[in-house]
Amino acid sequence: MAAAEPMGPAQVPMNSEVIVDPIQGQVNFEDVFVYFSQEEWVLLDEAQRLLYRDVMLENFALMASLGHTSFMSHIVASLVMGSEPWVPDWVDMTLAVATETPGGSDPGCWHGMEDEEIPFEQSFSIGMSQIRIPKGGPSTQKAYPCGTCGLVLKDILHLAEHQETHPGQKPYMCVLCGKQFCFSANLHQHQKQHSGEKPFRSDKSRPFLLNNCAVQSMEMSFVTGEACKDFLASSSIFEHHAPHNEWKPHSNTKCEEASHCGKRHYKCSECGKTFSRKDSLVQHQRVHTGERPYECGECGKTFSRKPILAQHQRIHTGEMPYECGICGKVFNHSSNLIVHQRVHTGARPYKCSECGKAYSHKSTLVQHESIHTGERPYECSECGKYFGHKYRLIKHWSVHTGARPYECIACGKFFSQSSDLIAHQRVHNGEKPYVCSECGKAFSHKHVLVQHHRIHTGERPYKCSECGKAFRQRASLIRHWKIHTGERP
């Protein structure tokens, strides 16, 4: 086994080439690692150090998921423990080229050799590579849940190893083009292609990219450029001026240099929209041409994009690969799982710009906004009546058809809507799912709870236009209005 000369972290050349095996496409962890001296490290604040740690650990997880588990084990261990990343005095920095062994080590990989006299307390492994953590490490660590099956792992290294048990599972999907990824970081990098955002913004960050461009030949990219920019840009010690022509992420097309400069060269002749990639333009043009080249073999339905066809086919196969880690409910689309999880988190990301009311679904916000705009886009073809919500039109349509397909098995009463049947059944079972947060009183219908809650808030939204008197309930306003009209109540 041939050994190289000892090398400290400050001696590592920042613009060294990535070692790539021409057959295997081997990429080493050292090639995407950012080195700091102790003097450089103290200039970073806490947020920058945490960002550094997260970026490096995610890079390692990506390496491990690809089966490339070569790394400097003492540095990865210090990242897991949250300690400083520079090389301690007790570490023997002798690097050796590992030969192929019966244990299955990858040929041509670099492995860090530690001092055998240093006592260690914990150890854990990824594949054939083992990390040992010194005594005195933290007793508690952050939990890392698997985005595919919900299993919670104790560290990111075990998570990376576990995710290899889900072949072909890519839970992170781009909502613009349907492309799927194993890691959220890859999705984030991919989305910059749609937004036109430049992945690497200045020559200042070049020394820390460690020729990340060479890694782009693989299917998964590493989080080094954009994420590192946030803490590199704040410190003047990282200034490095290099001519633009030294940095060549690609080599063949004319558009690649323009893409690095943030330009978009592929323009749609129909609407003028521009794209940085030709395949994105081709997909977009199907909006104008109506082309749907991907056909479902089961039902014959066609789609403009292959990932959408794959999602559709789960209707026929019954496949439900996305499971909620909290309640166990399964879904056929990752987007449905994301929307469902808002039930548990209470997240309401869609906010009305007029009144500030927030909703968990975008469609609900659109329906709500019609209250402010007065828009009623849904017209009944029978009587010409307009409605602000589509579901109200559907409900109204039963007036003309007389259809009441939903029957109560307790009393035989029929209803035109399933929601009306569910609400009616509470008369029989006594269920009162809507509880007042102020006094604890429960109600069988949500609108009754809303009316009751106004007792606590003092809200009186229904105002008489004649005398100005306000009421908590609409029915009370209608009864009051008869005083002015002279109509007998």
From Swiss-Prot:
Its main location: nucleus. InterPro entries: Ikaros_C2H2-ZF, KRAB, KRAB_dom_sf, Znf_C2H2_sf, Znf_C2H2_type. It is found in: Nucleus. One of its GO terms (cellular component) is nucleus. It comes from the Eukaryota. GO terms for molecular function: DNA-binding transcription factor activity, RNA polymerase II-specific; RNA polymerase II cis-regulatory region sequence-specific DNA binding; zinc ion binding. SMART domains: KRAB, ZnF_C2H2. Keywords: DNA-binding, Metal-binding, Nucleus, Repeat, Transcription, Transcription regulation, Zinc, Zinc-finger. A zinc finger (C2H2-type) spans 144-166, 172-194, 266-288, 294-316, 322-344, 350-372, 378-400, 406-428, 434-456, 462-484. Pfam families: KRAB, zf-C2H2. Residues 27-98 form the KRAB domain. GO terms for biological process: regulation of transcription by RNA polymerase II. The keyword 4Fe-4S does not apply. The keyword Disulfide bond does not apply. May be involved in transcriptional regulation. Belongs to the krueppel C2H2-type zinc-finger protein family. This is Zinc finger protein 772. It comes from Homo sapiens (Human). The gene is ZNF772.
